[in-house]
Amino acid sequence: MLVKHLSEPWFSLIYCGKKTIEVRLDKGHFHDLKPQDTIEFFNDELGFNMRRKFCIKVISIEQFDTFELLLEKHISNALPTVKSIEFGCQILQQYYSKENELHKYKKLAINIERVSAVTNEPRTSATSC
């Protein structure tokens, strides 16, 4: 199972069902991702030495050449609080600051479904769904 940090507001938007598309570059662990795989997302930004986490299941994966093309199709499900493709691209580029990464890798629209409730545990706990 893949375990990945997810920052706010994306963590809460996925949990409440507003965000059903996760956007990632087609590299590393995400290059090998396939439908039915499980990802545990965690967030420890609230402090208090606590980690919030939940699991999602991958439903499907689409590849795109650019963030613009991906957002033309999926902006409302990938970035539900964002109304323009231009602003959405700016947000996504903050996470992928290396210019060569943006051109080297395809962009993935990962259709996801939450399969577990949020749990709050001490940061040192093991992962499990």
Would you name each region that the model predicts?
Residues 1-35:
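Compositionally biased, charged N-terminal/linker segments
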Residues 3, 38, 49:
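Short histidine
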Residues 30, 46-48, 63-67:
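Short, charged/polar surface micro-motifs in flexible loops or helix N-caps
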Residues 31-45:
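Short coil-to-beta transition motif at edge beta-strands of beta-rich domains
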Residues 35, 54, 108:
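Residues that flank catalytic or metal-binding motifs in active/ligand-binding sites
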Residues 49-63:
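Short beta-strand-centered aromatic/proline hotspots
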Residues 69-129:
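Contiguous surface segments at macromolecular interaction interfaces
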